[in-house]
Each structure stands twice: as C-alpha cells, then as structure tokens.
Swiss-Prot record:
PROSITE patterns in alphabetical order: LRR
Domain of life: Eukaryota
Species name: Homo sapiens (Human)
Tissue and organ expression note: Ubiquitous. Maximal expression was seen in the heart and skeletal muscle and minimal expression seen in the kidney.
Subcellular locations according to the entry: Nucleus
Annotated LRR repeat ranges: 155-176, 178-199, 201-222, 227-248, 250-271, 273-294, 295-316
Protein name: Leucine-rich repeat protein 1
Keywords: Leucine-rich repeat, Nucleus, Repeat, Ubl conjugation pathway
Length: 414
C-alpha cells in the first residue's frame, strides 16, 4: 500500500537543542511494508519513506509505536503522525484526501498489531518512475505529445494543452483535484462539461481561441464561485453570458475579446473583485446600468459597435402595477429567497433579470429606459480608447421604476 505526498520528518529533540527544522517538505512515496521471513509469518509492519534522493528509503516500525494521529486537516490532504521511537513527527501534505484516509486507517491497524486487509509491500526500493506522479506542471503544445493511453500525473497544479486539436475537454483532466491553472487555448472545444466545476482549487481557466458559443449556468453555480480568479474566453463565438455568470464573484481578470457579444450580463456590477476587463472587438451596442458599480484597474472596449444615445426614453410604465410586478418588486426588495422548487422556473428567470432603478429599487416589466454616455474613466483607472477617434465614452442604459424617479434623475440623461 502506497501514498504519494509531501513529507517532512521533524525531530522533537530539536527545540531542546536550540535548533529549528528547515520547515519544508519533500516529495516522497510512503509504503506500508511487512518484513517477510521463511520461518514465520510476517508480523512486523513498517512505514517506509522513500524520496528521489533516497530511493531505498527510511523505515519506521509501526506496531505499538504510534503515539498520536493529528487529522484535523485530513480533508485538505494534510495529517501528522507522531511516533514514540524515534521521537519524530511525520508531517504529510499535498495528498489526495481519500487515499490519505485509507493509508492512515491501515497505519492504525498496523500499530495495534492487527492484520491489514489491503495489500502491503515488501521492503524494496522505490522505482524512479513512481516519482513522475509528483509533477506539478505539464505543458503540451502539439498533437504528437498529447498522452492517449497514459493518465496525467495526479499532482498537477498547472496543465496546458494547446494546439492539440481537442474538440472536447478530456475527462482525465477533471480528475486532477489539485489543478489550479488549466490552459486549453487554441483548440476546437465547443462545449464545457459541468464537471469542470468540481475542480475546487481551479483559479485560472484559459479557453482562448476555441469554438465556444456559451458559458453554462451549471459552471456559474459550481465551486468556481469561490476559486476562479482569471477567465479567458477570447476568440470564441459567445453572444451572451448568463445572468448567473455574475455569481463568479472572485473573478479579478476577465477576457472576452473577439467574440460576438451583444450584451454584458445585466448584473455585472456584482463582480465586486473584478479589476481587469477586456471585451474588445465585439458587438456591444451599449453597457448595462450596473456597469457603473464596477471598480476596475484596466478596461478595454475598443472596436465595439456602440450606438448613439437615444434622445427619447422608452416608456413601459404600467398603471396600476400588475400583481406580478408588485409581487416581484416586494420579493426582491425584501430579499425573500426563491427558487424553482417554490415558484415556476420562468418566474425565477424573470426575477434574476430584473432591472435596478437608479434609486436602488427593482422593476420587472414596468419601467422607463433611458440612454446616456458615460466616461469610462469613472469606473477604470486605465482605459483603452473605444475607437480610432480617441474616445473614452460609451453609451449606458439607465432604468427608472416610476415617473417620479425619471423626473428627479432627468439631469443624468442630458
């Protein structure tokens, strides 16, 4: 039975001698071994720690020799085993949590002198090939180098597979639970599987130059909400992003250049951590009202088909308000939870896409819509010119929930 992880062996005598441990783990293969003998059955179990420099490894007897297990962070792939003799703490990290739990269970049995129900190894040196699983970065930039029959190393944190002609995301990639950066640029991928959202540590996702036409709602509801920091969707065929896209609130860098975008998500202002936004060479006619809420360091909207602000507003006021409109406003104003298990799905969609008045209230189908220009420097420190004439202004939509709000805010439309 073996476990691949990082190991640090700390002597508990060091503090008494005024010494400090170096504080850094090394990549190792841990083996649960038994010493075999022809005359008697194997009864002694050992923990063998092998590293790339010491393939024969260092062994520690386990039977009645474990003082304590520290497993508070076992779900994060971390644990510590304290031995009696020698007086050392074996600190384990960067392990697959399920494998670590099984390995620790086997060590407990060995400590008690019980039979281990899983296969155990003999005391033999570890092969160099086993350390290939510790690679944290792999870059593949051609079809001929792409592995067809061999799995990706489980410990990968950075994987790039560009110019490989991929038409779909390889399911083997979705088993890399330590992955932090995934670069699938310059392929032919048309659709993203929802299981990408299971990569709980994924911080950077590069899908530049593919054939994507959409970004799924399932990904917006996944663990990417808490992990994803950078997303590159440039050079695809995306026309619109779902309103749920704005739930990816950890995003800091978003690239949407060279798509077919006709609008931003209406709630884009909810991306409170967004600092770099690039959406050059799309088909944006105007910006949504919540665009004003962004606080960017860099903004590039060059080459979009921005329209001139309309002189006359679009009036869609209802008098009196319908029951649907009144109920929707009440639900949103009071932040009452809703979902498809409570109300029909199409009503959930209506609530998700509700407009926000300049006064902060919500409106569904009863509103006044006006368009004005906004200097992009009001939301970004650095602004790329929006056209060849040196402009830094773009049209932005404003909504008003009532005639009173429109009259009181009419100066902003001049």
């Amino acid at each position: 039975m073996k476990l691949h992880c990082e190991v640090e062996v700390i002597s508990r005598h060091l503090p008494a001698l005024g010494l400090r441990n170096r504080g850094k783990g090394v990549r190792a293969v841990l083996s649960l071994c038994q010493q075999t003998s022809r005359s008697q059955p194997p009864v002694r179990a050992f923990l063998l720690i092998s590293t790339l420099k010491d393939k024969r490894g260092t062994r520690y007897e386990l039977r009645e020799n474990i003082e304590q297990f520290f497993t508070k962070f076992v779900d994060e792939g971390k644990a510590t085993v304290r031995l009696k003799e020698p007086p050392v703490d074996i600190c384990l990290s960067k392990a697959i949590s399920s494998s670590l739990k099984g390995f620790l269970s086997a060590m407990r049995l060995a400590h008690r002198g019980c039979n281990v129900d899983t296969p155990v190894s003999t005391l033999t040196p570890v092969k160099t090939s086993e350390f290939e699983n510790f690679k944290t970065k792999m870059v593949i930039t051609s079809k001929k180098d792409y592995p067809l029959s061999k799995n990706f190393p489980y410990s990968l944190e950075h994987l790039q597979t560009s110019y490989c002609g991929l038409v779909r995301v390889d399911m083997r990639m979705l088993c890399l639970k330590s992955l932090r950066k995934l670069d699938l640029s310059h392929n032919h991928i048309k659709k993203l599987p929802a299981t990408i959202g299971d990569l709980i540590h994924l911080q950077e996702l590069n899908l530049n130059d593919n054939h994507l036409e959409s970004f799924s709602v399932a990904l917006c509801h996944s663990t990417l909400q808490k992990s994803l920091r950078s997303l590159d969707l440039s050079k695809n065929k995306i026309k619109a992003l779902p309103v749920q896209f704005c739930q990816l609130q950890e995003l800091k860098n978003l690239k949407l250049d060279d798509n077919e975008l006709i609008q931003f998500p209406c709630k884009i202002g909810q991306l409170i951590n967004l600092r770099f936004l690039s959406a050059a060479r799309n088909k944006l006619p105007f910006l949504p009202s919540e665009f004003r809420n962004l606080s960017l360091e860099y903004l590039d909207l060059f080459g979009n088909t921005f329209e001139q602000p309309k002189v006359l507003p679009v009036i869609k006021l209802q008098a009196p308000l319908t029951l649907l409109e009144s109920s929707a406003r009440t639900i949103l104003h009071n932040r009452i939870p809703y979902g498809s298990h409570i109300i029909p799905f199409h009503l959930c969609q209506d609530l998700d896409t509700a407009k926000i008045c300049v006064c902060g209230r919500f409106c569904l189908n009863s509103f006044i819509q006006g368009t004005t220009t906004m200097n992009l420097h009001s939301v970004a420190h650095t602004v790329v010119l929006v056209d060849n004439l040196g402009g830094t202004e773009a049209p932005i939509i404003s909504y008003f929930c009532s005639l009173g709000c429109y009259v009181n805010s009419s100066d902003m439309l001049k």
